[in-house]
């Protein structure tokens, strides 16, 4: 069985006749990077939210959608929407505190993430002073700190300049190669991204 699989999957919002999401067939293998491409309004974000197991989406489903991942990190399109604390170091450990990680283990995990992402110069910074690229870097680092098997990124570079966007995609490939995390990315465009991914799925 594929790590993530959909067959004739449809999702309908309440009182809607046409599906917000339709996927005839999708198979995503564990440890790969998959790019979902499609225009605005085609259902990419709704599909990602369903893959992430979000329970707050009301609606009706048809067909099958299965996800074998244990743990999922979700990175939003707008870097500011995800940051909830005022210090970079606090942001990284926020999720670890929520799952009740022991203090010493949390310190070790923080040190590992800082080293892996090269955050030594940012760790004591106020999150409000970070650039858009630095904020998205922090969001990805915070998600990976939770040791997820799956990372979902919803247009993670849409609000970044080309240099910052390239750095984020280099980082995504590095994460995949070093940690084996399965990564699903949604974008509106295909240009310049083919080299970063293993498979492209069009919606």
Residue ranges: model-predicted function:
Residues 140:
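Hydrophobic anchor residue at the start of the ABC signature
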Residues 126-130, 134:
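Conserved ABC ATPase signature
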């Amino acid at each position: 069985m594929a790590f993530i699989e959909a067959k004739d999957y449809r999702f309908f919002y309440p009182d809607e006749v046409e599906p917000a999401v339709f996927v005839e067939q999708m198979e995503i293998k564990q440890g790969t990077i998959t790019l979902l491409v499609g225009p605005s309004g085609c259902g990419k974000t709704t599909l990602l939210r369903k893959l992430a197991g979000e329970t707050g989406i009301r609606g009706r489903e048809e067909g099958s959608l299965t996800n074998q991942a244990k743990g999922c990190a979700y990175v939003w399109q707008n870097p500011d929407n995800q940051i909830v604390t005022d210090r970079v170091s606090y942001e990284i450990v926020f999720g670890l505190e929520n799952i009740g990680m022991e203090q010493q283990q949390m310190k070790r995990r923080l040190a590992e993430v800082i080293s892996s992402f090269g955050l030594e110069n940012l760790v004591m910074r106020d999150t409000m002073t970070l650039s858009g690229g630095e904020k998205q870097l922090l969001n990805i680092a915070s998600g990976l700190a939770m040791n997820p098997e799956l990372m979902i990124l919803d247009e993670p570079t849409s609000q970044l300049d080309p240099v910052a966007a390239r750095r984020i995609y280099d980082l995504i490939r590095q994460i995949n190669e070093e940690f084996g995390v399965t990564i699903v990315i949604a974008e509106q465009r295909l240009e310049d991204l083919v080299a970063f991914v293993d498979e492209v799925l069009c919606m």
